[in-house]
């Protein structure tokens, strides 16, 4: 893995952290309308992607392949919408850090399984004991982050 790819992944993560509270503020401006905020978020993203796609060219050739694709390949937009709607709704309920910690745990567990079995067209990358220990350490960190204060207070009061 090159350093540039690692830095890009870090920046993407920072952008995801900004996305949820920005979309939540938009929902508040729309009278707590989570769906409308998600819709506008996607409209802005769609407009941006349209400009990039047109600038890149080759759209007719790429679209010609669309009818032959299985339906599951079109689920990315649905999953993205579910993530955006869920994020907008959950940020004020559980907080941004808790939301993203749990999102990361969900992504980590599912990505380890997807990699291990080579699902949805991924190259098979077996789950090794080292990867498993790393995932457990990350998940333990999330548990401490979410419940550590309560655990400490319970230990102190006993």
Where are the predicted features?
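Hydrophobic/aromatic residues within the transmembrane alpha-helices of Major Facilitator Superfamily
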Residues: 14-18, 47, 78, 82, ...
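Hydrophobic transmembrane alpha-helices of multi-pass small-molecule transport proteins
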Residues: 127-147
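Hydrophobic/aromatic residues within transmembrane alpha-helices
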Residues: 37, 90, 117-119
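Residue-level signature of transmembrane alpha-helical cores of multipass secondary-active transporters
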Residues: 8-10, 72-73, 100, 135, ...
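C-terminal transmembrane-helix exit sites in multi-pass transporters
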Residues: 109-129
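Membrane-interface alpha-helices at helix entry/exit sites of multi-pass transporters
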Residues: 33-40
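Membrane-interface interhelical linkers
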Residues: 1-11, 25-28, 35, 46-72, ...
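Structural motif at transmembrane-helix junctions in multi-pass transporters
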Residues: 32-33, 86-102
């Amino acid at each position: 893995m090159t350093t540039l790819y690692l830095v890009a992944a870090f920046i993407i993560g920072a952008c995801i952290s900004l996305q949820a509270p920005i979309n939540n503020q938009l929902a508040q401006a729309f009278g707590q309308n989570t769906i409308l905020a998600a819709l506008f978020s996607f409209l802005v993203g769609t407009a941006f992607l349209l400009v990039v796609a047109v600038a890149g060219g080759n759209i007719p050739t790429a679209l010609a392949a669309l009818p032959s694709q299985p339906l599951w390949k079109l689920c990315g937009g649905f999953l993205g919408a579910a993530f955006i709607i869920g994020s907008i709704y959950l940020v004020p309920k559980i907080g941004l850090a808790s939301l993203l910690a749990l999102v990361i745990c969900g992504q980590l567990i599912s990505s380890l399984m997807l990699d291990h079995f080579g699902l949805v067209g991924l190259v098979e990358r077996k789950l090794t004991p080292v990867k498993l220990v790393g995932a457990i350490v990350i998940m333990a960190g999330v548990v401490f982050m979410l419940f550590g204060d309560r655990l400490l207070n319970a230990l102190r009061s006993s």
